[in-house]
Amino acid sequence: MNSSVCVVIVTYNRLTDLKITLEKYEEQTIKPTSLIVVDNASRDGTYEFLEEWKSNGGKFRRLAIHSEKNLGGAGGFSIGIEEAMKSDCDFIFLSDDDAIPKEDVLEKLFQHYNQMHLQENIAALCTRVNDQFGISYVHRSMVRKGLFSIRRISTQEKDYEAPYFDVDLLTFVGALLKRSTVERIGLPLSEYFIHEDDAEYSTRIRETGRIVCVTDSIMTHPFGGNETKHWIEYYTTRNYVNYIGRHYPRRYQVYAELEKYIKKCSIFAAVVKHRSKNYRRMNKIAIKDGRVGNLGISELYKPGQEIG
């Protein structure tokens, strides 16, 4: 089966990484039919580079979309997928500007897909993701539902001993979407801006079919450490509460709000976690905004803002 695939990459101020990544797609054993780069208003020369890159031709169609402002990963992938759907591609492959594809990443995905039975039950596929330490298990997860809450369980080493296995959640690093899936579920929620957009989209994908992780199709994505910028946590908290409310019964959202409040807003957060008053206030606002659907870029907590 010969399938056409459009690659979508979102970039923001990582020109050095982007150059390396784009070269790797030229080296694929199965070439994409097109590659779309969404530039989230980078300020490091990305605009000029992409204008030259797309005019130089290559082994597939090149397209650069320059946003006038930073739309976050959620907004970037949303407009990238929307543009890809204007073509006649059968699949859309999503990844980051600093995620390096092995030369046969697409070949392996299609090789296993073509051998699978009941292909109509498969909504998306995804790669294994490695970092500098080995397999990065957090990129692929399972969901377990309890009476009041859900648990996300990261994949484990034993899962990767099989040629492929099913997952419930994927990140947008090495995700291969069927065109028919996007036609059914629409685009990622651009109003999430950053964080939880991939989990929310995965949940919609799973409502239409399986997500299959192919273990010998490999992306390498560096682990960036555990340090979190405090302004980002506003979006993490807000979007998680909103996501749970969208896809699970009300009691799950109530539990999610309570859990976030205890960990990030309560006396426990102040005394045990040493969270500042501003940090706790930010998360209180995030919980409320998630509940009522006040999404988009917050006027109070814009990217890069110091919280204190």
Predicted regions and their residues:
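Short, acidic, metal-binding catalytic loop of nucleotide-sugar glycosyltransferases
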Residues: 23-32
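Conserved donor NDP-sugar-binding/catalytic core segment of glycosyltransferases
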Residues: 104-140
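A short, conserved alpha-helix in the catalytic core of glycosyltransferases
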Residues: 168-187, 191-217
